């Protein structure tokens, strides 16, 4: 079973069950969720979600389901981004959301997203460090790569 079909099946399972567990896939939520190693516990969506919740949703016109963090709640929907990404998705509608991350198993350890102090600290630090990570990966690192390539070309 592919990771994509795993989440699609999860969305179908949530219509029948209150809570499900799925193996994670992809790198957009690293370092919190590791690809093919961690298990996400997702519960059916009930009511309006809040900032820092991690919904299971699909983009309009797509059958692909994704887990990303809510950055902002707007009157039109949600602004969402993966922890390991820089591009935000705007106006994700409530009808596109089928579930929300309740907890996850990391290395066999159960981490509750509502009660764990370590998880809440991770969310705070991840959000606070975003400008520095964006600056490093978006500007400094590519510039250093170009300088390195220029130096290598001149030496050969």
Give the location of each predicted region:
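Acidic/glycine-rich C-terminal interaction modules and beta/coil loop segments
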Residues: 58, 62-156
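Short, low-complexity, intrinsically disordered N-terminal peptides in bacterial proteins
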Residues: 1-5, 153-156
